[in-house]
Amino acid sequence: MREAMEFKRPETFEDILNLQKELDKNIRDNRERVLEDIKLSLIAELIELNEETKHSHKTWKTKEYNRDKELEELTDVYFFFAQLINYKSRDGRFQIEYYCEEFEIFPGYYAGAYFTGLIYDLLDNKFRWFFCSLLTLSVKLGYTKDDILNCYWEKWQKNMERIGKEWN
């Protein structure tokens, strides 16, 4: 296994995709991971993110807002979305350029993004809509492209260390 220190902080969505490929290559799955697994992981992470926002669906609970935890959960969504894009582009027919270009105009997003809408787009295989809504949600939550790239890099390094220890 390569050490995480051989890699550098991502600066683009394409860098995230490449780091995700490396992470996924090193993780030993108990069975082949299929698109349905990745979609379910994304849905789980979207719900975890929602639970960390100021407007969680858990209206019956009071929980102190933690911006760092919210960003970490948002970054987890990007991890699994990168995994999904890599999975879909394995045969070369799924074009990643759109996603790389959209990430570059990250701060320009302004539209409504709702968690259930994200889930519907994912289930309907509307990955472009999902990604646009994810970028919009990121902005609405007050995060920048650098916030996502920095958090992704930190968490990627931790995940690489977890391989073979916490993750068997």
Regions found by a protein language model. Give the residues of each.
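Flexible "arm" and connector segments at domain edges
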Residues: M1-N168
